[in-house]
Amino acid sequence: HWQALAQKHDCALLSPTYEQPGKADCQMWCDPRNGSYKTFLKSLHDLGKMSGHTELSKVPWALWGHSGGGHWVGGMTMLYPNRVIACWLRSGVPMLEANPERPQIKPHDLPADVLKVPIMCNPGTKEGVTEKKGRFARVWPSNETFFKKVRGAGGLVGVSIDPLSSHECGNSRYMAIPWIDTCLFDRLSKI
């Protein structure tokens, strides 16, 4: 599915993964300001050089991330809004306000250019929407706060709650891919 989307738009598909060691602090990598953005930019440069497509270091991005990856792609959107075509946040969003319950998470600024980027928040219903207790119950309140802040500033943000899932990705790709496809079609034509 993802490969077909990339081929349709003549895009490169890069799927980095990171397995966090048990009890490690997610913020060390999922907040790109802690240095992971440098690794990403270097990987685009290196992949471009190795593949003979040096333009990879300069092309726009369509970003999708899950959990800490959602926080990360949202953070990259805050840092590089002029490079982002679309951003899909599955079960994780960057914080835009300080949370006294989670002081280790630094809030991001909301640059004006972010308001032009289509962003979709996609939590599972069992992440605080219909199930209010449990390990992932904080996901929906974080998404709701993010949504209200971005939409309140006039941003292009939506919410699509997966009606069947919790923190797993489930079948969310069946909505994410057509949404990103539409964003690519609309926004790439304007570059």
Task: Name each model-derived stretch.
Residues 70-81:
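Short glycine-enriched nucleophile-adjacent loop
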Residues 85-174:
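The feature captures the conserved acid-bearing segment of alpha/beta-hydrolase catalytic domains
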Residues 176-191:
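Catalytic active-site module of serine/aspartate enzymes centered on a nucleophile-bearing elbow/loop
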Residues 53-67:
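Alpha/beta-hydrolase fold nucleophile elbow
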Residues 9-23:
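Conserved alpha/beta-hydrolase
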Residues 28-55:
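Alpha/beta-hydrolase active-site loop
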